[in-house]
């Protein structure tokens, strides 16, 4: 059985490919033309890049990368050859600390809402087609090739001997998980 990992830009996808035997990474755009030839697990780790959310200007492109490609890609697959679907979602759907406002607050809410919509697309598709599925809401990932996490920012700050500004006076409590643990 092959493991098809959708989402080539992601550091998590790269780590999954290293850990999972018989796996192949496919870009989101190529997901639309994917032809499954044998029983496969589909791991969907594809979404609009998190690090670009604060700079979001083209909402049509955001929705295309986040939801349209997902829905269309699933619809085009040969349902009989799907063993299982795993969708990596985000803890962002649980909401934000409303006491701390930043410039991209609205875009983060849009990101969270679209992640929840994507979960529902996967759930409805899988249920309708009687395909086992898992929604994995991952929290604070870090690891090799990571350029976005708070952990990578702390490491870069230390390497560059820069100051690191910690919001909330350091009162926030977070759990962190490495790519290796998820893989």
Describe the function of each predicted region.
Residues 6, 45-49, 85-91, 136-138:
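SDR active-site strand-loop-helix element
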Residues 123-174, 179-181:
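NAD(P)-dependent short-chain dehydrogenase/reductase
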Residues 1-21:
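N-terminal Rossmann NAD(P)H-binding glycine-rich loop of SDR-like oxidoreductase domains
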Residues 96, 106-134, 159:
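Active-site Tyr-X1-5-Lys
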Residues 71-110:
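Conserved Rossmann-fold NAD(P)-dependent oxidoreductase catalytic core, especially the SDR/UDP-sugar
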Residues 34-68:
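NAD(P)H-binding glycine-rich loop region in Rossmannoid oxidoreductase-like domains
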Residues 63-67, 103, 107-119, 149, ...:
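Short-chain dehydrogenase/reductase
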Residues 53-61, 96-104, 147, 170:
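Conserved catalytic-core motifs of eukaryotic protein kinase domains, centered on the activation segment
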């Amino acid at each position: 059985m092959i493991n098809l990992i959708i989402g080539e830009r992601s550091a998590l996808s790269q780590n999954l490919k290293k850990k999972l035997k018989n796996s192949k990474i496919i870009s989101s755009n190529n997901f639309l033309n994917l032809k499954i030839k044998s029983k496969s697990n589909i791991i969907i780790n594809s979404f609009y890049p998190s690090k670009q959310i604060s700079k979001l200007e083209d909402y049509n492109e955001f929705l295309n990368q986040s939801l349209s490609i997902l829905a269309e890609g699933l619809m085009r697959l040969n349902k009989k050859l799907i063993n299982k679907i795993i969708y990596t979602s985000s803890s962002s759907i649980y909401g934000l600390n409303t006491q701390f406002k930043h410039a991209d607050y609205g875009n983060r809410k849009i990101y969270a809402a679209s992640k929840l919509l994507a979960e529902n697309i996967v759930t409805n598709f899988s249920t309708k087609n009687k395909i086992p599925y898992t929604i994995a809401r991952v929290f604070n990932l870090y690891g090799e090739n990571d350029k976005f996490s708070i952990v990578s920012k702390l490491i870069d700050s230390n390497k560059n001997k820069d100051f690191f500004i910690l919001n909330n006076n350091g009162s926030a409590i977070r759990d962190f998980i490495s790519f290796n643990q998820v893989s």
